[in-house]
A protein has these predicted regions:
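A short helix-loop-beta-strand connector motif used in the catalytic cores of GNAT acetyltransferases and
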Residues: 59-73
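Acyl-donor (CoA/ACP) binding surface of acyl/acetyltransferases
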Residues: 1-27, 31-39, 75-187
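Conserved GNAT-fold acetyl-CoA-binding loop/helix
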Residues: 38-59
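Hydrophobic residues in alpha-helical segments
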Residues: 32, 42, 64-65
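Short, conserved alpha-helical segments within structured domains
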Residues: 45-49, 70, 141
């Protein structure tokens, strides 16, 4: 049975995954929410003002009182900066699975942070939430994200062809998943 425990702090070797705070607004603007390329790959709008980011933070922060809400600020321990986010944005209570989404600012990409955060959230899902399956998707054009997903040990499930229309062309959506038994066999 799925157990809802909400967004609790997770610590890894180089990161702290914690609830968003209003003081994260400047780092969010600096590192990712105003970056059109990142937001496009993430299928999110660009936020260009503190007021817009405050509205986004209002949505996140007001949801933390729900035990079935899972969204973390990804904070680099060394700098104390909020460098991205990760979430179980879709949680299916009936079928005991959840889907991860993540976003890391371009200054911090290709350093293993997305992999480190994703592995921690996978473990949280299986160990704390009692999930049966974790799934994750990426656009076919997002090669760095595909590498993160593969490094985390997900199994490729299939491609939804021409799923997104971006910049005048169609882009596919890759689906990956990990079952509890697969996670446990890697321990």
């Amino acid at each position: 049975m799925l157990t809802h425990v909400g967004t609790n702090t997770i610590e890894t070797e180089r990161l702290i995954l914690r609830k968003f705070e209003y003081t994260d607004d400047e780092a969010m603007l600096k590192y990712w929410v105003a970056d059109e390329k990142i937001q496009s790959l993430y299928s999110e709008p660009v936020y260009s003002t503190k007021e817009e980011v405050k509205g986004l933070l209002d949505k996140y922060i007001s949801s933390y009182d729900k035990s079935d809400y899972y969204r973390w600020a990804v904070v680099e321990k060394k700098s104390g900066e909020c460098i991205g986010q990760i979430a179980y944005f879709l949680v299916d209570n009936k079928n005991h699975f959840a889907e991860i989404e993540y976003c890391i600012g371009s200054d911090f990409q290709c350093k293993g942070y997305a992999t480190e955060a994703t592995r921690a959230v996978i473990a949280y899902g299986f160990n704390k939430m009692n999930l049966h399956k974790v799934q994750i998707c990426t656009k076919t054009i997002n090669k760095p994200s595909k590498r993160v997903i593969e490094k985390c040990g997900f199994t490729y499930e299939g491609t939804l062809r021409d799923y997104f229309y971006m910049d005048g062309e169609y882009v596919g959506r890759l689906y990956f998943s990990m079952l509890r038994t697969e996670f446990e066999s890697k321990l």
